[in-house]
Amino acid sequence: MIELTHASFQYENSDRGVQDISLSVKSGECVVLTGLSGCGKTTVTRLVNGLAPSYYPGVFSGSVRIDGKDISRLSTWEIGRLVGSVFQDPKSQFFSSELAGEVAFPCENYGLSAREIRERTDAAIEALQLSHLKDRAVDILSSGEKQRAAIASVYAMKPKVFVCDEPTANLDAAGTRQLAQTLWQLKEQGFTLLLAEHRIDWLMGIADRFLYLRDGRIAAEYTPEDLRLLPEADILGMGLRSPHEGKCLPAPSVLDESPAVLKTAGLSKRIRKEVIFDDVSISFPEGKVTAITGQNGAGKTTLAQILCGLTRQTRGHILIDGKKARAAARRREIYYCGNDTSTQFFTASVAEELLP
């Protein structure tokens, strides 16, 4: 189904890329590309879905075939009928404001009949277990729900191949389990899956093979059983998350009573009629690390953005050093680093980004 033969690609004005990639993925197989950040995983997925070099300019050699077709001879829309892509940040591929419209959009874009659009949209939403969210605005979906919405929009087009780039990057444990179930169902239905992922534990029951990339080349191939038998030190040395249960650092035996530099009092947030969280009162001790955890959609990101003054609360107060602090004051005192760091960059180079 997927055939890369001596495929090499180097990005324009960069030394990054992949060299001499030859791989074959059979119909209905699930293959995972894994390795350290920057090893070439994403670039291989871009060769398969045609984004490189059509969208990402660079020098390409070799061949890429999908279902026997040389994609260099296909137009972008023709590749899109064969290969569906799900990106690390699903927001980057949304075109509609509500879920049903988002799932229908690819079918509309390809000019399918109104009847077929409705049938495919309803079938995709049901298959991805999103019926209860059908009319929900996509901007208030949890990360896991957004990922499933992105998969549903691809599913509606019935491609032969699904390409997923780091699909669990923004998912919690529950969202990851849900995604694993979704991909397993797709595989059972005969779809071919190619994933780029460095978290391998959740894929052990889905993947048929793992291809380990290093410096833009395929360095090794493993079955799930091969990886289970590798010493944990070897897996960590490869830059991968262990397929075994993780270990936590020990908690301090004594918790000292440090003064609270930041507090919330009765904090509540609603978006339209949706209650994101209600009556949250937290103290953040000076010089300590406080972790806010919970499932996708619990309100963690919204709370962080409110603390930093990037969005407003519905009710309640935030205090810095015991004094109420308005949003403008918080923006001067508290800094925010989101899960998609690319949205915080304003310049084209590291040096320019760091300049005041």
Model-derived features: positions:
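H-loop/switch region of ABC-family ATPase nucleotide-binding domains
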Residues: 197-198
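Conserved ABC transporter NBD signature motif
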Residues: 57-69, 316-330
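Conserved ABC ATPase "signature" region
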Residues: 115-133
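Helix-to-loop junction immediately C-terminal to a conserved catalytic motif
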Residues: 49, 308
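Conserved ABC ATPase signature
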Residues: 137-141, 145
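The feature captures the beta-strand-to-loop junction immediately N-terminal to the Walker
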Residues: 34-36, 293-295
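Catalytic Walker B motif of ABC-type/P-loop ATPase nucleotide-binding domains
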Residues: 162-165
